[in-house]
Structure formats: structure tokens, C-alpha cells
Amino acid sequence: MFMLRVSRRGLATATSVPRLKTFKIYRWNPDKPTEKPHLQEYKVDLEDCGPMVLDALLKIKNEQDATLTFRRSCREGICGSCAMNIGGANTLACLCKIDQDESKTTKIYPLPHMFIVKDLVPDLTGFYQQYKSIQPYLQRTDYPADGKEVLQSIDDRKKLDGLYECILCACCSTSCPSYWWNQEEYLGPAVLMQAYRWLIDSRDQATKARRTMLQNSMSLYRCHTIMNCTRTCPKGLNPGRSIAEIKKQLAFD
């Protein structure tokens, strides 16, 4: 019986019709400065590939072109490494399902309006420097005398829901036109949402300094409520609302 099942499975695999899906992927190699950026076409058999775009990218890299370069790590939407522009939208390749229509070509680009290291790898140095600039850590002038942790109420803890889940993938910031044109000074949706996360943390005692840092014409107020950030967030968060809440706080300063 076991041999019969194995033979039937093997026959089904051998006779299955390939379902070839076309992917056009952005390619650029800094080691070849005379070669312009271009889209390179690959075909992947959907019958022999996982359901996510990252599965297709790994299959291409492992079986067709080892030079294809992209970031990836957890494959579970936790690390944010595989953020890229897929089919015109910023998202995570590990969470983006492959369009099963073989007649449609899927185009994959790096996150838009960023310097590119190679292929699908954006340079996030500036993005991380902006994140560092908001001092994203607990700041206090005094601590409990007994040396224990600083506690907060259940209600205060709930205020952080929808904020701390950000994985800093930069999908939202790189979908924002204001960030495209002003990223040297405008902090962008992702960083501002984290700024708000620390502004409303009941345990933090640097609220005044944090507000002062944001009270200028560029760091915060380049947001024009386009809301691309909220639409594209792969974690379902709402950076636009966080920015609006910061503006409300600063209006009373």
C-alpha cells in the first residue's frame, strides 16, 4: 500500500503542468557603474514554489541567479528586512502573496526614493539616524528607591498598543511624498510614530524635551495627511493618526 501511494504521488508530480509566473525585478550593481538600472525577467513555476513573493525570490536566487541581492531574515513579518515595492505597493515580501494569475507580470523594485546599495537593497542609514535622533528609550530623572522597575497602569499600557508593534521596515516613510522630497529634515511617519510612542509613555520623564525637539517647521509639520503611510503599513498600524496626535499636543505648548 505504501509503495502504491508513493508511486501515485510521483506520477502526479511528473504529469503536473508547470504554471510559469513572470517576475520583473529591479537590478543594479555598483560594481558595474556603466550599466544602468534595469528590470530583469525571471520565470517561476508556481507549482513548485511557496505562496509568498519571498519564496519566489529565494527560488530565483537559489536556482536561477545567485547574484540577485535582497534582504530577508525572519520570513514571518517580524524583522522588516524584506521591505520592498511589489506591484506598486510598499510591503514585506514574506507577507505578500504571489498573484496566482500567470498572465500578469509581477514587478519588484526596492523601496522608492532611497539610495540603493544593490538590486533590492536600500540604504537605510539616514532612516536609522533619524530614529536615533528621537532618543527612543526610557528617560527618567529619578527611579524607585527600592531599585524595582517603573510600573504603569493597565490603561497607560494600552495607550502603547498600535505603536510598539512597529518593526521599522520603512514601508510607510518611503511611501510618503513629503518624505521623498524632505527626508534630510522631515522625520517621516515611522520615526514620528515612535516619537509619539515615547511622548505618551507614562513612565518617561523627558516629555518636554521631546516636544521641544519636534517643535519646528520641518521635523513634524511636513506631514500633509496624504495617508499613504497608513494604507501601506504591512502591520496594519496608523502612523498618520500618531502624527496628528503629536500636532494636537504641540498646539497647546
Swiss-Prot record:
Record-listed [4Fe-4S] cluster binding positions: C166, C169, C172, C233
Residues annotated as binding [3Fe-4S] cluster: C176, C223, C229
Cofactor binding annotation: Binds 1 [2Fe-2S] cluster. Binds 1 [3Fe-4S] cluster.
Pathway: Carbohydrate metabolism; tricarboxylic acid cycle; fumarate from succinate (eukaryal route): step 1/1
Names of the cofactor(s): [2Fe-2S] cluster; [3Fe-4S] cluster; [4Fe-4S] cluster
Residues holding a ubiquinone: W181
Catalysis: reaction(s): a quinone + succinate = fumarate + a quinol
Residues that coordinate or bind [2Fe-2S] cluster: C74, C79, C82, C94
Broad class of where this protein is predominantly found: mitochondrion
Compartment(s) where it occurs, according to its Swiss-Prot or TrEMBL record: Mitochondrion inner membrane
Record domain 4Fe-4S ferredoxin-type: where: 156-186
Enzyme Commission number(s) from the entry: 1.3.5.1
Membrane topology field: Peripheral membrane protein
Example GO molecular function: 3 iron, 4 sulfur cluster binding
Residue intervals of the 2Fe-2S ferredoxin-type domain: 23-114
Keyword Iron: yes
InterPro entries: 2Fe-2S_ferredoxin-like_sf (IPR036010), 2Fe-2S_ferredoxin-type (IPR001041), 2Fe2S_fd_BS (IPR006058), 4Fe4S_Fe-S-bd (IPR017896), 4Fe4S_Fe_S_CS (IPR017900), Beta-grasp_dom_sf (IPR012675), Helical_ferredxn (IPR009051), SDH/FRD_Iron-Sulfur (IPR050573)
GO biological process, one term: tricarboxylic acid cycle
Disulfide bonds: none
Swiss-Prot/TrEMBL keywords: 2Fe-2S, 3Fe-4S, 4Fe-4S, Electron transport, Iron, Iron-sulfur, Membrane, Metal-binding, Mitochondrion, Mitochondrion inner membrane, Oxidoreductase, Transit peptide, Transport, Tricarboxylic acid cycle
Function: Iron-sulfur protein (IP) subunit of succinate dehydrogenase (SDH) that is involved in complex II of the mitochondrial electron transport chain and is responsible for transferring electrons from succinate to ubiquinone (coenzyme Q).
UniProt subunit comment: Component of complex II composed of four subunits: a flavoprotein (FP), an iron-sulfur protein (IP), and a cytochrome b composed of a large and a small subunit.
Protein family per UniProt: Belongs to the succinate dehydrogenase/fumarate reductase iron-sulfur protein family.
Protein name: Succinate dehydrogenase [ubiquinone] iron-sulfur subunit, mitochondrial
Organism from which the protein derives: Candida glabrata (strain ATCC 2001 / BCRC 20586 / JCM 3761 / NBRC 0622 / NRRL Y-65 / CBS 138) (Yeast)
Lineage, uppermost ranks: Eukaryota, Fungi, Dikarya, Ascomycota, Saccharomycotina
Gene from which the chain derives: SDH2
